[in-house]
Each structure stands twice: as structure tokens, then as C-alpha cells.
């Protein structure tokens, strides 16, 4: 299939229509039904971003709440060590919940489907929001910690559900662009949490429980809207054998009556699945055709978290303060705005430049910026302009993250696997993401204490390593169906078994589908 773009298109809508029109000879539309379904799904991504960023701004106030509550109960103030440990637990237990939730993705999606799973787990969001929102009234530190654990479980599940659902309902030529919307939801959630966390909005001593409990509202909104969204047609046909329903949903989502080629691809995959036993987590590592894609998936997730991005956002206020910024919270919000803008840019680029290229550009830019951050922090006391260099390096660091390492690892996992192993793969990849997230949050303060400005050199080393791995090991998936990608890995695994060599270079040499002339 050779495609080549012609005509001028402006705006996000025009860009998406341009991509869609290149899928097949007949014209497809970006339908309201497709946009609505993806938008509703990304509310789960928003929840993940919001609850990741919401705990940072009210840190001092929440510590005071913990101190006062424990003092009133014990008639004596807690030790500084206990206070610090309880605060750290309140932050870190969110990631523990995320690890458990992400590893449980397959238990839900195979039993209830993609859409219904998103609907059911909103009960966790409501429960976690209530626990956190009422902890001050109840004078209970335990409710705060338990609420963070429950909302972490919810967010961990969402990190598997949302990319999987979006990938399965999106046309092949739009899969990357729409997959990026998952990351856009996350960064908007982080930005909203930063803004709401300002003392003049919800970050005050009186309103911080409302700030934490706000997560109930998106859960209610998504629960009301999800029944209007279709189930994944791939799930209906491949897992439930409901071909007629799947065909009807594809026609409505993609705006065309001719979906026979896509239905046939799903039927072929379904036939192959019926000859295989159910894929477990262990099978992903035992079967040669799954082993390489799961390793790629894990490393790409690690490249996101070990890039240092969460260290920047978790401790951004302190970093800006160390850099000499008088109002560091506003500088942190500026980083959140940059985060959002460049995620939108990635939406435009991912189907043109490709996943692999953008990921390498992002990693390379971040490696340079993390080195520059180290230099500027070391020299800021000697040269006045170094504070501005540090801020600039952080903003460009964030921009590079959102070009590649931010959005791509989430949706590329769904692309690398067929319907059978996909839930298990999403669980493993998501758990590796949350685990590395937890370790960065746990270890970064100590590393920063002992290493000072040199701490970001550690991330530079990781970034260079991940850049090399992406160059040598990660294939390009742009413009390829799930079936194409699966067969390529299977053929590569068989070739590697026969030759005794790693066939990954063959995958890297596979060129994505080129464009053919179409008029929009």
C-alpha cells in the first residue's frame, strides 16, 4: 500500500480528516461518535493526571493536618520522622495502588469488555474521592492514606483500559494520533491539579479536602456518558464472536459502510486465537513471538519514568526555588502549560514522523536538557543568568518528553500485540511503569540530597541508554494493522529461532506504509 498526501489541510480536525482519508481508497470521516467515545474514555486519563499532580501543592497544609490530628489523638505531637513518613506514605501509596491496579487490567477487560470495565471502576474513583474529601471532617489520617490507595487502584486500571479502548476503536491511520489523546488527558489533568492547587483557588487550609475529593465529579461525568459509547468492535468480534454488532459499530464510528477488510482482519485474528490457549503473563516471556514485543514494551515504559520527568514534576517547585525563582509555583504551572502544548504538537506529528523517530528525538533532547540542568544548577550562584538557563532547560525537557516518551509508550504497547496477549501485555507494561514511577518518587529525594545538582546526570545516563535501545530494537508501527505487526514479530521470531540470531534489525528496516495522493 503506497500513500501520498496531497492538498492543504489546516487545524486539528482537518489534520485528522486528512489522515483518515489516506486509510483506504474510499473516504472515511472522523465521526462525532468516534470523537465522543474517545473523549469520554480520556476522562480516565484526566483522572490519572489530576491525582498524580494534586498532592504536591497542599503539601505543607496536609502535613499540618496530619500533625494536628495525631497530636489531638495522642495528646503529644508526633516526631518529625513519623510526620515525614506519613506524608511520604500518603504520596507513595498512590503508586502502590497503581501497580496493583495496572496488573489487574486483564481480569476486567476479558470478562466485562473495555467499555464496561471503565464504567465499573468509577466506583473506585468515587470511593477514593469520598475518603480523601471527608478525611478532615472525620479527623482521620487513615482515610487520607486509604483514599490515595483506592484512587491509585483506579488510575492503575485506567492506564490499561484507556489506551486499549482507544487503540481498538481507532482507524489504523489515526491510531497514533488518537492514542496521543490519552497522554493529552493526563497532562491536562496535571495542569488542572496545579491550577486548582493554588491557595487562592482550592489549595487553602479550608478547601484542600475539596481539592482531593474533586475526582468524584469526572467519575460521575464519565459514568453518565459511557453507556452512550460503543463497546470495542474488536472485543465483540474476536472475544464474543458478535460479528454483526462489530460491523455495525465500525460503520458508525468510521463513517463508512465498507468495513469488510477490517472485519476480515479481525476474523483472521479470531481464527488464530481459537487455535491458541489463553495467553498468561508467563507466556509473554516464554513464547518467542511475544518475548521481544513485551521486552520492548517494558523498556519503553521505563524510558518514560526513568527519564526524570516525574522527578521534575514531583519536585519542580523546589527545583525552581533552588534556581532562584521568586514564585516557583507559577513556574511549575508554566511547565504544565508547555506539557499540554507539546502533547498537542505530538498529535500532529505522530502519524507523519512515526513513533520510533519521535521517541528518539524526545529522548535525545531530554538527555541534552538534563545535562544543561545540572550545569545551570551548579553555576547559578556564580552567574546570575543561570537561573533562567535552568528554567529554560526544564521547559524544553518537558517539551521533548511530550514529543515522544510521554505519549508513545502508552499506546504502542497495544499496537505490538494481537487481541489475545494484549490485556496481559498491557498489565505487565503498566505495572512496570507504575513500579518505576514509585521507585523514582521514593529514591529521588535521597539521591538529590546526596548528589545535589549532579542528580540529573543519572537520568542523562538512562536517557542515552534508552535512546540506543530504541534505535537498535524498536520497530516502526505507523500505518500498520495489528495483524501486520503480529505477523512481523512471528516471522522474526521464527527466523531468529532458525538462525540463532536476533532478528530485530529486520523489524527496524521495515518501512511504514507510504502515502498515496488523496484530496481533502
UniProtKB/Swiss-Prot annotation:
GO terms for biological process: cell differentiation; D-glucose import; D-glucose transmembrane transport; dehydroascorbic acid transport; spermatogenesis. It is found in: Cell membrane. Residues 51-88, 139-148, 199-207, 315-328, 380-392, 445-451 are extracellular. It catalyses: D-glucose(out) = D-glucose(in); L-dehydroascorbate(out) = L-dehydroascorbate(in). It is a multi-pass membrane protein. The chain crosses the membrane at residues 30-50, 89-109, 118-138, 149-169, 178-198, 208-228, 294-314, 329-349, 359-379, 393-413, 424-444, 452-472. Residues 1-29, 110-117, 170-177, 229-293, 350-358, 414-423, 473-520 are cytoplasmic. The keyword Membrane applies. Glycans are attached at residue 67. GO terms for cellular component: aggresome; nucleus; plasma membrane. Residues 493-520 are annotated as: Disordered. Disulfide bonds: none annotated. D-glucose binds at residues 183, 304-305, 310, 339, 402, 410. Mainly expressed in testis. Also expressed in small intestine, liver and kidney. Keywords: Cell membrane, Developmental protein, Differentiation, Glycoprotein, Membrane, Spermatogenesis, Sugar transport, Transmembrane, Transmembrane helix, Transport. SUPFAM superfamilies: MFS general substrate transporter. GO terms for molecular function: D-glucose transmembrane transporter activity; dehydroascorbic acid transmembrane transporter activity. Gene3D superfamilies: MFS general substrate transporter like domains (1.20.1250.20). GLUT14 is a recent (less than 5 M year old) duplication of GLUT3. Belongs to the major facilitator superfamily. Sugar transporter (TC 2.A.1.1) family. Glucose transporter subfamily. Hexose transporter that can mediate the transport of glucose and dehydroascorbate across the cell membrane. This is Solute carrier family 2, facilitated glucose transporter member 14. It comes from Homo sapiens (Human).
